[in-house]
Amino acid sequence: MRNPNQCSWYPARVLCAVVVFAAMTVSFSPSTRAESWGGIQPLKSRRIDVERLLGKPLNEPSGDESTLHFNVAGGSVTVSFVNAKFVVNKKLQPALEGTVLQIVLQHENSSDTPDSMNLLKNRDFDRQDERDITVFRNLKGGVTYTFITGKLRTTRYSASADQLVRARK
């Protein structure tokens, strides 16, 4: 004999599973969020978060300077912050002042290549070549890789295009 309660809940369960899957797909899609590095996220993390994760900076910014420099294993990191002038010029929400604008990693001896990072066939990245410099940009994800003579030298993390649109007033 069949349990009538078992069948009546089945369509609701399926619908719920589909809705949850769709919500997770949208929230974790690369076009809706920026790449982060070491727990630091553009337009979300603040200076206190950066210092908690990376330690004391090499410099103490003065005046309008809004960048911090750190030494890390394998190179150095420069973290830039959103300042009041940037908020006004880009017509951003005032609450974003003081959040991370960009993270720049300078790699000293990286062995990564475009091929080893699977960038050559990745359609999310735009490629630009100039002499011995190759740049791969993903504006939707907010990440840019710069290779010099085939080796990774710089990685830049910034807000994604969608994040910047949502950050406007």
Annotate each PLM feature.
Residues 2-18:
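Bacterial N-terminal signal peptides that target proteins for export
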Residues 15-27:
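Bacterial N-terminal signal peptides
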Residues 23, 32, 39:
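Generic anion/oxyanion-binding catalytic loop in active/binding sites
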Residues 28-34:
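Sec/Tat signal peptide C-region and signal peptidase I cleavage site
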Residues 35, 45-169:
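A cross-family detector of function-defining hotspots
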Residues 11-12, 19-20, 110-115:
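General structural signal for secondary-structure boundaries
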Residues 40-44:
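Short, contiguous acidic and Ser/Thr-rich linear segments
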